A protein has these predicted regions:
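Hydrophobic h-region of N-terminal signal peptides that target proteins for export
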Residues: 8-17
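Carbohydrate-interacting regions of secretory-pathway proteins
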Residues: 17-264
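Positively charged n-region of N-terminal signal peptides that target proteins for export
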Residues: 1-4
Length: 264
């Protein structure tokens, strides 16, 4: 009986791939993180140090550090995160939560990205695909106001003529309370260029899941969002994590090549 149960369990785990399930979920699949369940994921943190990462601005003060663990104590300091500094798979943006923005040394084009993050109360960060297009990280937990392009899960707006333009508010408020680990899964399609270098298709967020809930679908990006790197749009650029807007911790950052979108 135990052998039969084991065989049935393995078969059940294999069924989704055998049935050709869509590589892009719309928030209807839950369980362990995708990098544990699916093939092709590349870790962007090595579990020891910050190899593979650098300050986006070489002249900026870089206080990012790795930690074995991170702690949030609401009654002692709700606006702070405390990391146990040393070799580990979590990274924090300095003791004060305000330091340089961090970039990968590797450049990415079309990519599927998964990452986990923790915020202190009222904190703010962002993940910039290609250093240009931001999915906002913000403490929106408990908000009952209509969602805006400044809330967690938003595609942040551009800044044109001293005002915010465009962007995309999240479809739902999926934020968890400060001090809890949260996750993004992002499907990003890079801009397209012709042989002369002229852009012929805008970049696009095909899907964004925030804590497993669908918050963005097919959002075209006419240009870089606010506070992006001062670089031109291109087929490939590094990933950027914002480090100068308040305490944030990151772990389990994985990437793999974007697969075709199959709507089921």
């Amino acid at each position: 009986m135990r052998v039969l149960f084991a065989v049935m369990t393995v078969a059940t785990l294999l069924l989704p791939q055998q049935r050709g399930y869509s590589p892009i979920q719309d928030g209807d699949a839950h369980g362990d993180p995708p990098f544990l369940l699916e093939e092709g994921w590349e870790p962007l943190l090595n579990g020891t140090d910050l190899t593979g990462w650098k300050a986006c601005d070489p002249a900026a003060k870089n206080e990012w550090y790795t930690a074995r663990a991170v702690r949030f104590e609401r009654h002692l300091g709700p606006t702070q995160l405390q990391g146990r500094q040393g070799a580990g798979g979590t990274m924090l943006n300095g003791p004060a939560g305000r330091t340089a923005n961090l970039c990968t040394e590797k450049a990415f084009g079309d990519v599927e990205l998964y990452l986990e993050f923790m915020l202190a109360k009222g904190s703010n960060s962002g993940v910039y695909l290609q250093g240009l297009y931001e999915v906002q990280i913000f403490d929106s937990w408990g908000s009952t106001e209509p969602m805006t392009t400044s809330d967690g899960g938003a595609v942040y707006h551009q800044w044109i003529g001293e005002r915010g333009v465009g962007g995309s508010a999240p479809l739902v408020n999926a934020a968890r309370r400060p001090g809890e680990w949260q996750s993004y899964q992002i499907w990003f399609r890079a801009p397209r260029f012709d042989a002369s270098g002229k852009k012929i298709e805008s970049a696009r967020f095909e899907r964004v899941l925030f804590n497993g809930q669908l918050v963005q679908r097919d959002v075209n990006l006419d240009g870089a969002t606010r506070a992006a790197l001062s670089i031109p749009e291109a087929a490939q650029h590094p990933l950027m994590l914002q480090g100068d807007h308040g305490p944030v911790a990151f772990r389990n950052i994985y990437a793999r090549p974007l697969r075709p979108l199959i709507v089921r």
